[in-house]
């Protein structure tokens, strides 16, 4: 595909390289993603560590009529038995990471994925493209509705390369002690478990 001329609307934006999101280019032709450079919708990337206050900022965005797309909700959707993602996870980590209904068994998947850096990288290399594809579908749907601004709430915004489609990045930060207190309160766990 030829590089498009940069316009004020697309300045600073680029289409993802095929090597970055091979899964997406496998499912759609490059011209099908051209709408990303022509979008009339501002995309805000919202990220930060757990307990920093991303959910609070996301609620503020929603209160100001900014459509919020939540990465965790997308993961729940792609983990459904109807998605190809669980089968791909089983091929990588073994069938024991799936429940009888074909959905991932999160504790078993976490145990397998967090057993090594390589396995965690493998998990991310499988899940992130599925999440990105669904995110792009949702953004395209919002653009069709005339939505002017979308916020994408994603703890792994940079790790998944989702930042590449964002016009603005908002990173929510808080002191570690504040985050630990919030995590303990939110999840009902002891401070040692929050570490």
Where are the regions a protein language model picked out?
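Hydrophobic anchor at the beta1->P-loop junction of P-loop NTPases
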Residues: 46
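P-loop (Walker A) phosphate-binding loop of NTP-binding proteins
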Residues: 49
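Walker A/P-loop
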Residues: 55
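ATP-dependent NMP and nucleoside kinases share a basic, alpha-helical "lid"
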Residues: 136-144, 152-185
